[in-house]
């Protein structure tokens, strides 16, 4: 028996109880492919070159290699059908790849789980394996996915797309039936309040804290307050209320977070050196500053008032999931929410003064994230990844409260899991031109200018 067949015999047996597959140390059979594996391409003229490479491997000699074959139209690679899938059961797929001369790995190196019925028809849409981490020269990709209704097998698809000079090697492939992860519930509260004639940042903050005490009862995981809670109602300029982080306002928010054992997010104005930022802070359950986000997209009015823009889209790994922050005018542009989603954000917390509800809904839908807003001239709500309002606080002095499930999958009837598809099909490698420039030239004056 070859090393491959021994591996399959010991580890790749599908039983009625569960499926556990391990494949590595690949050895080519007479047709050039390891047992069970075959080449797939949409058309012969766009097929890649596939081969077993005994020289490039991760743990034991022999990997599944795909070459772009000097063809810019190339798309395809290795496939293997695995029987013994149980409809409705959960499976964890893991594989490792090494890429050479691949311009954009995020969409050109593809792993998918293509679920099939007993008659080998598609049982729903394929699941893209989009989670990845570097491990030396190799990249680990993995996915936890639920087999659709009527699924009886799954085709493991390992592809290379439109990379004529590239080679990718796949190794250490596993598929395991695993326990249902169950719900991952997070309770969120978002506050609708607009203090007026407070004359001080401290008084405005006090009114927000008082409203939380009056409206938010029971356990919460995160509480969101609006943009600029230290300036609203005060009649003061940004520079007059700007403070350091940590500072007096984060200390008061920290007391709230600690007393409720809840994360708290809010917009304040931050001073660092000569710069003043429109900043959103995230306070952890112990009352410490977990992190901050400086508003990237400043409207002209804020620039003229002396604010400085930020330059990054951080995400924060909390004890319930991954959180991103946006502020107000950010919602008018696609890239803040997109950047947060590609970094793994599951919930975007958005302190906002006023903004476009339609664009906010688009940000949730296109990135398949929960979007939470707390605003003055913008509604206060909790929105799901389909853009549906789960809770809305319509009156001042009220709170929108909802419990969401971060493990819930939002599937499109025709397209499948759009979160996974977006992560793998997003073309960040195609650069947009600079606004106002045509073919690299400065635009001509027009309209009498």
What residue spans do the PLM features occupy?
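Beta-strand-turn-beta hairpins that frame and shape the catalytic cleft
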Residues: 179-188, 315-324, 347
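Hydrophobic h-region of N-terminal signal peptides that target proteins for export
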Residues: 7-17
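C-terminal beta-strand edge segments of enzyme domains
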Residues: 136, 142-144, 315, 375-449
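Active-site catalytic loop in hydrolytic enzyme cores
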Residues: 271-343, 358, 362, 366
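A structural microfeature
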Residues: 124, 169, 291, 390-391
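Cys-nucleophile CN-hydrolase/nitrilase-fold catalytic domain and related Cys-dependent amidase chemistry
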Residues: 202-206, 210-285, 338, 354-362, ...
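Extracellular and organelle-lumenal recognition/adhesion modules and their flexible linkers in secreted
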Residues: 15-187
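CN hydrolase (nitrilase-like) catalytic-core segments centered on the catalytic cysteine
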Residues: 245-264, 322, 328-405
């Amino acid at each position: 028996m070859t090393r491959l067949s021994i591996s399959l015999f010991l580890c790749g047996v599908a039983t009625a109880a569960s499926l556990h597959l391990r494949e590595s140390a690949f050895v080519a059979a007479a047709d050039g492919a390891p047992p069970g594996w075959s080449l797939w391409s949409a058309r012969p003229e766009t097929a890649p070159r596939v081969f077993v490479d005994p020289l490039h491997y991760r743990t034991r000699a022999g990997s599944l290699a795909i070459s772009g074959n000097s063809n810019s139209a190339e798309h395809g690679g290795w496939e293997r059908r695995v029987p013994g899938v149980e409809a409705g059961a959960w499976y964890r797929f893991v594989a490792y790849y090494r890429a050479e001369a691949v311009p954009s790995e995020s969409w050109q190196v593809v792993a998918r789980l293509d679920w099939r019925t007993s008659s080998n028809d598609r049982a729903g849409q394929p699941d893209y394996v989009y989670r990845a981490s570097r491990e030396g020269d190799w990249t680990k990709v993995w996915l936890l996915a639920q087999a659709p209704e009527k699924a009886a097998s799954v085709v493991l698809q390992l592809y290379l797309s439109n990379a004529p000079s590239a080679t990718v090697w796949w190794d250490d492939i596993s598929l395991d039936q695993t326990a249902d992860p169950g719900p991952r519930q997070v309770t969120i509260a978002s506050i609708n309040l607009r203090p007026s004639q407070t004359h001080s940042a401290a008084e405005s903050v006090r009114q927000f804290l008082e409203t939380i005490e009056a409206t938010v009862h029971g356990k919460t995981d995160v509480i969101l307050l609006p943009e600029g809670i230290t300036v609203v109602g005060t009649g003061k300029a940004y520079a007059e209320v700007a403070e350091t982080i940590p500072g007096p306002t984060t200390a008061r928010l920290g007391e709230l977070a600690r007393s409720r054992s809840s994360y708290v997010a809010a917009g304040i104005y931050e001073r660092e050196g000569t710069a003043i930022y429109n900043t959103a802070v995230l306070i952890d359950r112990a009352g410490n500053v977990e992190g901050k986000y400086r508003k990237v997209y400043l409207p002209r009015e804020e620039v003229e008032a002396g604010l400085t823009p930020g330059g990054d889209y951080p995400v924060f790994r909390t004890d319930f999931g991954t959180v991103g922050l946006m502020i107000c005018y950010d919602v008018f542009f696609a890239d803040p929410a997109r950047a947060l989603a590609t970094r793994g954000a599951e919930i975007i917390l958005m302190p906002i003064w006023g903004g476009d509800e339609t664009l906010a809904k688009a940000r949730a839908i296109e990135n398949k994230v929960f979007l939470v807003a707390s605003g003055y001239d913008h509604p206060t709500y909790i929105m799901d990844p389909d853009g549906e309002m789960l809770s809305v606080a319509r009156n001042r002095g009220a709170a929108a409260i909802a419990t969401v499930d971060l493990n819930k999958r939002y599937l499109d009837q025709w397209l499948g899991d759009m979160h996974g598809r977006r992560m793998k099909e997003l073309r960040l490698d195609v650069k947009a031109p600079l606004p106002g420039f045509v073919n690299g030239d400065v635009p001509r004056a027009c309209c009498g200018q």
